[in-house]
């Protein structure tokens, strides 16, 4: 059960976290460029 449960929780978590981190780093990069 755990072998089937872990990927089903892990994959959507990564699928949501990776774009969120990418968007956050992108927005911070844009803010730094605007300030400078």
Curated annotation (Swiss-Prot):
Major place of residence: plastid
Subcellular location: Plastid, Chloroplast thylakoid membrane
UniProt GO cellular component terms: chloroplast thylakoid membrane; photosystem I
Record flagged with keyword DNA-binding: no
Residue stretches spanning the membrane: 6-28
A GO biological-process term: photosynthesis
Keywords annotated in UniProt: Chloroplast, Membrane, Photosynthesis, Photosystem I, Plastid, Thylakoid, Transmembrane, Transmembrane helix
Entry membrane topology: Single-pass membrane protein
Pfam families, per database record: PSI_8
PANTHER family in alphabetical order: PHOTOSYSTEM I REACTION CENTER SUBUNIT VIII, PTHR35775
Function (record text): May help in the organization of the PsaL subunit.
Family affiliation: Belongs to the PsaI family.
Name the UniProt record assigns to this protein: Photosystem I reaction center subunit VIII
Organism, as annotated: Calycanthus floridus var. glaucus (Eastern sweetshrub)
Lineage, highest ranks first: Eukaryota, Viridiplantae, Streptophyta, Embryophyta, Tracheophyta
């Amino acid at each position: 059960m755990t072998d089937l449960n872990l990927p089903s929780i892990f994959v959507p978590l990564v699928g949501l976290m990776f774009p969120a981190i990418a968007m956050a780093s992108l927005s911070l990069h844009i803010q730094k460029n605007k300030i400078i």
